[in-house]
Amino acid sequence: MSYRMFDYLVPNVNFFGPNAISVVGERCKLLGGKKALLVTDKGLRAIKDGAVDKTLTHLREAGIDVVVFDGVEPNPKDTNVRDGLEVFRKEHCDIIVTVGGGSPHDCGKGIGIAATHEGDLYSYAGIETLTNPLPPIVAVNTTAGTASEVTRHCVLTNTKTKVKFVIVSWRNLPSVSINDPLLMLGKPAPLTAATGMDALTHAVEAYISKDANPVTDAAAIQAIRLIARNLRQAVALGSNLKARENMAYASLLAGMAFNNANLGYVHAMAHQLGGLYDMPHGVANAVLLPHVARYNLIANPEKFADIAEFMGENTDGLSTMDAAELAIHAIARLSADIGIPQHLRDLGVKEADFPYMAEMALKDGNAFSNPRKGNEKEIAEIFRQAF
């Protein structure tokens, strides 16, 4: 087998496993941190002896001063970044610790960008637009889904235009990522379901991406297998540590895959739903994934047939196209089994917005690695099929 040249980016240091949170203080110290801005949301901060309290304890034990910014919203806004930056500067912080899922991680990256780059954040939307080093970021992850703790992506919402934009740069990579499955125990079933489908979408889109390579394929394949075998159990019983560990590992692998292979139309379209309707990102991905998969099927039926097998479908004796169809059914069945809404109409979406969302989706950075090139009419039709 011959290989074309490819690069592969991951954070400098990654810690995984029960009690991994215990290293957060010493790692901040090794990075030269003296005063940390802990970025999180009000819900996580309110949990007694939860991830935020544990992080604070370990930071203080290591001699790190901490100030907490808990103003992060779901689908983090540019205004959240502005407010966090004000605290970062006022308190003279020199390191950022993010605690939570994708929203705190992306907001923390945004604060780091704003602290080191002039101008409007939106002006940096795109790939490798950042020119200055960010403050060190230590990402403590609490959900199995977005994998922002291991990626170069910073996804924010422009509150003026209600458009989600992505800043993709190796400078966004956290210096340290921490995945402690014990911090994920007991998460609500709807959150577990949505973030789990986000992870599956990462793995599937990375696997079929035009930018996929052998390393990203290996990570995506294992992620798909683990999610197919463990997501239902994690949703059904939040205290199932084995299922939580496997989902955390799957999310990590899927993140490492799409961090390098990029994504596709599911994310490009989901970003429009998140920006316009503030729809939870994982839910948007889950509703769209089967429909975008059907659209992409003819572009790479062999890989979709593989996905069917990875998800436990019996493809013996089937043609490649018939086996590929099973992948779509397996994805849709998993989503339904864990209680994800199946139609955009059930989520308050308006058909009148489809043309605009289709136009914006094709401008999203994730669209360019999709295996099949579409137009606005086709993307609007996918929205209608999901409606």
Swiss-Prot record:
Annotated catalysed reactions: propane-1,3-diol + NAD(+) = 3-hydroxypropanal + NADH + H(+)
Provide the disulphide bond pattern: none
InterPro entries noted in UniProt: ADH_Fe/GldA, ADH_Fe_C, ADH_Fe_CS, Alcohol_dehydrogenase_Fe
Q: What is its EC number?
A: 1.1.1.202
Q: How, per the record, is this protein's activity regulated?
A: Inhibited by the metal chelator 1,10-phenanthroline.
Into which family does the record put it? Belongs to the iron-containing alcohol dehydrogenase family.
**Name listed for the protein in its UniProt record:** 1,3-propanediol dehydrogenase
> From which source organism is this entry?
Citrobacter freundii
What gene name is listed for this protein?
dhaT
